[in-house]
Amino acid sequence: DASTPHLDTYAAQRICKKSGAKLIHEVRDMWPITLLELGHMKKYNPFVFLIQCAENSFCKHADYVVSLLPYAKEYLIKHGMRDDKFRVSSNGIVLEEWKEQPSIPKEYDKVLKHLREEGKFIIGFLGSHTKSYALTYLIQAVQELDCLEIAVVFVGKGNQKEELKELASKKKCNNFYFLDPVPKSIIPTLAQRMDCLYVGAIHNDMFRFGICMNKLFDSMMSGKPILYAVDAPNNYVMDYHCGVSVEPESVEALEQGIRQLYTMSENEREELGQNGRQAVLEHFTYEKLAADFAALF
């Protein structure tokens, strides 16, 4: 059984009762509290009430509750889950996707070669160009640094892309490059052409339960240091010493983080990047995660 919006727990409970199977409920999204806090819906809204009853039911009746969010435990206990029912799982990477290294398109290769020939320090962002990832702060931080040796390469699309291009053009410096999205199979090769990778997010109260971003594991696997700007209690960048972690939505903090990575020696950056890659290989391949998951029960 999986979360959002929890109503399938009732059917799952009946099936398990008849078959004698164990009921394992996975929580990925925090419903209905997200509706209350971010959607500003009322506690006794009929839909919210319906989902809350379902959440209380799986907390009480599931044999185990599994979540990607390690800090959701106390919340779920308050809704009827026994302490010993909670298990934590994780997202990760498909190792086979990183074994093949397809070449990147010629126009992308041309841009990156040009930046490398000019001695640029390349910050990469690979993903959707939306407000969720706090990209305006990254652009403003680089502009404030006013350093011609730093370039940011954005690869992807999204509803904020034109706004970001406009912001990037406000200062007369050619630090920012916006490229179209590429197939997922090319992401590993492209990521490894950067000097560091940006992973950020705007503040979100729901992050207090923890966060598990696929983008972070891909970035760690690239072997490049990470500029990490996410406000969540679990922080793999700090845990595995694979980059620099800064306050999110802060131009000043991002400036400091960029400067710290830029002024490091290549050996220091290489060590950070390899720390992240090794952590993924040891803990976050889906083969390893599947074995760990099976051992939980």
Positions of the model-derived regions?
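Membrane-proximal helix-turn-helix segments that form the acceptor-binding/catalytic region
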Residues: 7-22, 32-33, 45-67
